[in-house]
């Protein structure tokens, strides 16, 4: 039986990983072992932060809605309660976008929410 030498496959695997580590500083982009650790850590951070991004944006939208609602004399929780009672179905992303880009439309929505609360 012929002896199997895996030098070519190892070189390919190492090269692939070092390409993933492009842009990393120092030996983290040149040395296979440290590059491997850096890439694995980067992938773990990326996985974690893809989930955190959803939370972060929701928090940002809520902060923006709350700020705009308070300018119209209503707190965030009262606004959401009023929207539910008025039967207005609009997600926080769209509501925050309205608050930033179209203050008149946001004020009209807040007025309907206030009416439903009264």
UniProtKB/Swiss-Prot annotation:
Name used for this protein in its record: Large ribosomal subunit protein bL20
The entry's keywords: Ribonucleoprotein, Ribosomal protein, RNA-binding, rRNA-binding
Family: Belongs to the bacterial ribosomal protein bL20 family.
Gene Ontology molecular function terms on file: rRNA binding; structural constituent of ribosome
Matches recorded under Pfam families: Ribosomal_L20
PROSITE patterns: RIBOSOMAL_L20 (PS00937)
Task of the protein: Binds directly to 23S ribosomal RNA and is necessary for the in vitro assembly process of the 50S ribosomal subunit. It is not involved in the protein synthesizing functions of that subunit.
Cellular-component GO terms for this entry: ribonucleoprotein complex; ribosome
